[in-house]
């Protein structure tokens, strides 16, 4: 299993693929900051763009788009008290009062840290649990 993970990492960490992931994260942050546009909707809108990419770059772009939308929703949640995505509804409770006190940058930074930490933890759990869970399911 470790050899497959390392082979996947070597393919995913190529410069072109990382640039598509970065592009997806930026586009996802913009889409998530627009109230009413969430990650799956942004993915549905950008799937036609993925036809012109390599498969690894396209998957990286779409995953980056979804993960960027998670944080992007907290931008409008903190600054406008209107969450951009359902995942960022909790940022309105603490983030908007901080923004009213003039600490909007701190609230956005904390939302970014929480988004990255939670997403990294969820990804690690998925990597570790997916194979044993699939064996039980089949």
What are the residue ranges of the model-derived segments?
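Helix-loop-helix hairpins and the membrane-proximal interhelical loops
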Residues: 1-58, 135-137
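Internal alpha-helical transmembrane segments of multi-pass membrane proteins, especially GPCRs
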Residues: 14, 23, 63, 108-113
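Transmembrane helix-bundle signature of multi-pass membrane transporters/permeases
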Residues: 29, 45-48, 62-70, 111-116
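Short helix-coil transition sites and intra-membrane helix breaks within transmembrane domains
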Residues: 31-41, 78-88, 121-125
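Membrane-interface alpha-helices at helix entry/exit sites of multi-pass transporters
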Residues: 56-60, 97-114
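Juxtamembrane transmembrane-helix boundary signature
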Residues: 60, 64-93
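Membrane-embedded alpha-helical modules
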Residues: 107-138
């Amino acid at each position: 299993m470790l050899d497959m993970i390392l082979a996947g990492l070597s393919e995913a960490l190529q410069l072109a693929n990382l640039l598509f992931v970065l592009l997806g994260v930026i586009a996802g942050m913009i889409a998530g900051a627009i109230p009413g546009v969430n990650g799956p909707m942004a993915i549905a809108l950008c799937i036609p763009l993925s036809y012109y990419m390599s498969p690894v770059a396209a998957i990286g772009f779409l995953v980056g788009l979804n993960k960027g939308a998670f944080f992007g929703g907290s931008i409008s949640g903190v600054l406008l008290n209107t969450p951009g995505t359902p995942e960022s509804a909790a940022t309105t409770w603490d983030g908007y009062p901080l923004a009213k006190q003039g600490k909007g940058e701190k609230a956005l930074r904390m939302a970014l840290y929480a988004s990255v930490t939670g997403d990294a933890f969820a990804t690690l759990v998925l990597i570790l649990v997916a194979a044993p869970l699939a064996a039980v399911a089949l």
